[in-house]
Amino acid sequence: MRILKHHEQKLLRKVDFLNYKNDDNNHRDVMVMRRYHISKREEYQKYNIICGKFRQLAHRLSLLDPTDPFRLQYENLLLEKLFDMGILPSKSKMSDIENKANVSAICRRRLPVIMCKLRMSQVVSEATRLIEQGHVRVGPHVITDPAYLVTRSLEDFVTWTDTSKIKRTIAKYNDKLDDYDLL
């Protein structure tokens, strides 16, 4: 490497290229992004902010008097909402929000992960590709965004689109292909 000029040395005086600080704080987000096939770090950061807001709301509710009717009403409302979204496994207690409402819980409700859970796809990356190509619908709506969060009530309505070649191939394999569907 060449010797740096005076103005370059002044600019890089506090930078050491040989012993840089190893930042191990991002290993968790890299693991979550890889496991759930999140392509953009901004999505992970949004999920992290949402989890922080859940925790903040739960903490503020816990500061109120335990017999306060406002606290009881909104605790039940928050627990029910998070359970219906699929983020919490049960609507039992507020401490579950601190322990179990995390980024992974939100990522488990993404459409590609639900497709793998329903055995529509073997891996999350393949499910993401199929969603982006428009092969999947939730209810009557065709979804092309892999970041779509599926609630517990909509989980039963995740199917292939009517025009999808995958649906036709599955019906042909199961001997349920109707001649009317070929039109």
From Swiss-Prot:
Listed Pfam families: Ribosomal_S4, S4
Location of the protein in the cell: Nucleus, Nucleolus
Alphabetized PROSITE patterns for the sequence: S4 (PS50889)
A GO term, aspect molecular function: snoRNA binding
InterPro entries: Ribosomal_uS4 (IPR022801), Ribosomal_uS4_N (IPR001912), S4_RNA-bd (IPR002942), S4_RNA-bd_sf (IPR036986)
Record key words, sorted: Nucleus, Ribonucleoprotein, Ribosome biogenesis, RNA-binding, rRNA processing, rRNA-binding
Coiled-coil regions, chain positions: none
GO cellular component, one term: Mpp10 complex
Every S4 RNA-binding domain range: 109-175
Function field: Component of the U3 small nucleolar ribonucleoprotein. Required for the early cleavages at sites A0, A1 and A2 during 18S ribosomal pre-RNA processing.
Family: Belongs to the universal ribosomal protein uS4 family.
UniProt-recorded name of the protein: U3 small nucleolar ribonucleoprotein protein imp3
Provenance organism: Schizosaccharomyces pombe (strain 972 / ATCC 24843) (Fission yeast)
Lineage: Eukaryota, Fungi, Dikarya, Ascomycota, Taphrinomycotina
Gene: imp3
